[in-house]
A protein has these predicted regions:
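Active-site-proximal loop/helix of nucleotide/amide-processing enzymes and allied scaffolds
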Residues: 1-30, 38, 47-50, 72, ...
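Glycine-enriched loop-and-adjacent helix/strand subsegments that border the catalytic/binding cleft
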Residues: 31-74
């Protein structure tokens, strides 16, 4: 849950802390292994889906991950955050943003999960999660660039393309 008394000055301090931590941490995945990610630019939802969907699309359960990107949307890191059931996966707000705070050069994030049914249509829970993520991104001053849901046969749903990223200035 977000601390609603989080002030802009605390946000600025958080940004500085993130910069300091990033200067001293190697790039690692959620299992602690050093990550080697391809040099690719995630400049639009279609490209992001083409690059990230193969990492989770064929799973028999829902998998939720976060892509950390640079100012020019270069993929810096990919972190699988949770694996759930055929119908859902748990998502913790801190777990979504911690990898971004610890990945050097991160200036934005994209969250991605699959629908094992193959139908990328978002559920009401997916929409609520996106709004919560937009609010958390605002507090952290870290843009949430998109929430992608991937299905089968290269199908995907982009909350950005659908205009459903909420009223988040950081997410625009």
């Amino acid at each position: 849950m977000l601390n609603e008394s989080f002030s802009p000055s605390a946000s600025t301090r958080g940004h500085r802390v993130r910069e300091l931590v990033c200067a001293y941490r190697p790039l690692r995945d959620s299992d602690g292994r050093v990550v080697d990610v391809p040099t690719v630019m995630l400049t639009d939802p279609r490209t992001a889906a083409a690059v990230l969907a193969p990492l989770i699309a064929d799973q028999s359960v829902e998998v939720f991950g976060v892509a950390c990107v640079s100012t020019k949307h270069r993929l810096l890191a990919w972190h699988v955050l949770s694996r759930g059931t055929r119908a859902s996966t748990p998502v913790s707000m801190p777990d979504v943003f911690v990898p971004a705070c610890l990945t050097p050069g991160t200036t934005g994030v994209m969250v991605v999960h699959n629908h094992p049914s193959g139908d990328p249509t978002p559920s009401p829970d997916d929409a609520r999660l996106t709004l919560r993520l937009c609010a958390a991104a605002d507090v952290l001053d870290l843009p949430l660039l998109d929430h992608l849901i991937v299905g089968d046969e290269h199908r995907y749903f982009s909350f950005r393309e659908a205009g459903l990223m909420g009223a988040s200035p950081a997410g625009r």
